[in-house]
Curated annotation (Swiss-Prot):
Family: Belongs to the DapB family.
Species annotation: Pseudomonas putida (strain GB-1)
Alphabetical GO biological process terms: diaminopimelate biosynthetic process; lysine biosynthetic process via diaminopimelate
Function of the molecule: Catalyzes the conversion of 4-hydroxy-tetrahydrodipicolinate (HTPA) to tetrahydrodipicolinate.
Catalytic activity: (S)-2,3,4,5-tetrahydrodipicolinate + NAD(+) + H2O = (2S,4S)-4-hydroxy-2,3,4,5-tetrahydrodipicolinate + NADH + H(+); (S)-2,3,4,5-tetrahydrodipicolinate + NADP(+) + H2O = (2S,4S)-4-hydroxy-2,3,4,5-tetrahydrodipicolinate + NADPH + H(+)
Pathway: Amino-acid biosynthesis; L-lysine biosynthesis via DAP pathway; (S)-tetrahydrodipicolinate from L-aspartate: step 4/4
CC per GO annotation: cytosol
Binding site for (S)-2,3,4,5-tetrahydrodipicolinate: H156, G165, T166
Single GO MF annotation: NADP binding
Binding site for NAD(+): G8, A9, A10, G11, R12, M13, D34, G98, T99, T100, A122, A123, N124, F125
Descriptive protein name: 4-hydroxy-tetrahydrodipicolinate reductase
Active site: H155 (proton donor/acceptor), K159 (proton donor)
Taxonomic lineage of the native organism: Bacteria, Pseudomonadati, Pseudomonadota, Gammaproteobacteria, Pseudomonadales
EC number(s) from the headed UniProt entry: 1.17.1.8
Length: 267
């Protein structure tokens, strides 16, 4: 059995991850961790996820459960994830990282850690989204510079980063396929007298509203026709199942920084 720990276990995504782990053959939740100031520390992780008692108590410190897991799943905040990364690197623990909002410099720290431990880092662990990335690469290469490209994403009102990590990853895939640098061609929102559109740019539009789990559309617009590639998530479980799938896939892998394209063999 693959022994899995979940960081941020008392949060919405954490509870969903607990459920996904418990539903997956070959996986078992052996540790659950949350903030030191959480009033839920000491509670049974299964009860937090409405699964009933499973005998795993919520801890407030990763170090306290260091001997109880093989791989840590972390969907938290960059500052938290980087601390956990240092811990896992020191103790030889594999990591699944679904945290978004990393800077370029912080992503480099993930790459450095990948020299010592196996890591799967992805902006989105949904199988559908990762298949969409493959389709976006194909579409961009075929349509080339003959289209305007816009990326529209929507998430719930509590999401703190914008654009979403998934939208940015979609932009990177499209830009790379076209030989462009996303940092140079990205346009984040438009207002006022913007002038005619530069076809080399890739636009981003963000919606934050209600309880939207995650919608992403990439629009390729030409004269007389347009192509839209859309993914809509209706449940966090799709991300959680992908993360657990990645945790099982990592078993026995050499140290490296992998992503879901590797897990799904889409390269």
């Amino acid at each position: 059995m693959r022994r899995i720990a979940v960081m941020g276990a008392a949060g919405r995504m954490g509870k969903t991850l607990i459920e996904a782990v418990q539903q997956t053959p070959g996986a078992g939740l052996t540790a659950a961790i949350d903030r030191p100031d959480s009033s839920l520390v000491g509670a049974d992780a299964g009860e937090l996820a409405a699964l009933g008692r499973i005998g795993v108590l919520l801890s407030d410190d990763l170090a306290k459960v260091a001997d109880e897991f093989d791989v840590l799943i972390d969907f938290t905040h960059p500052s938290v994830t980087l601390k956990n990364l240092a811990f896992c690197r020191k103790h030889g623990k594999a990591m699944i990282i679904g945290t978004t909002g990393f800077s370029v410099e912080e992503k480099q720290l993930l790459a450095e850690a990948g020299k010592d431990i196996p890591i799967v880092f992805a902006a989105n662990f949904s199988v559908g989204v990762n298949l969409s990335l493959k389709l976006l690469d194909m579409a961009a290469r075929v349509l080339g510079d003959d289209v305007d490209i816009e990326i529209i994403e929507a998430h719930h009102r509590h999401k703190v980063d914008a654009p979403s990590g998934t939208a940015l990853r979609m932009g990177e895939v499209v830009a790379n396929a076209l030989g462009r640098n996303l940092q140079e061609v990205a346009v984040y929102g438009r207002e006022g007298q913007t002038g005619a559109r530069d076809r080399k740019t890739i636009g981003f539009a963000t919606v934050r509203a209600g309880d939207v789990v995650g919608d992403h559309t990439v629009l390729f617009a030409a004269e007389g026709e347009r192509l839209e590639i859309t993914h809509k998530a209706s449940s966090r479980m799709t991300f959680a199942k992908g993360a657990v799938r990645a945790a099982l896939w990592l078993d026995g892998r050499e140290p490296a920084l992998y992503d879901m394209q590797d897990v799904l063999e889409l390269r």
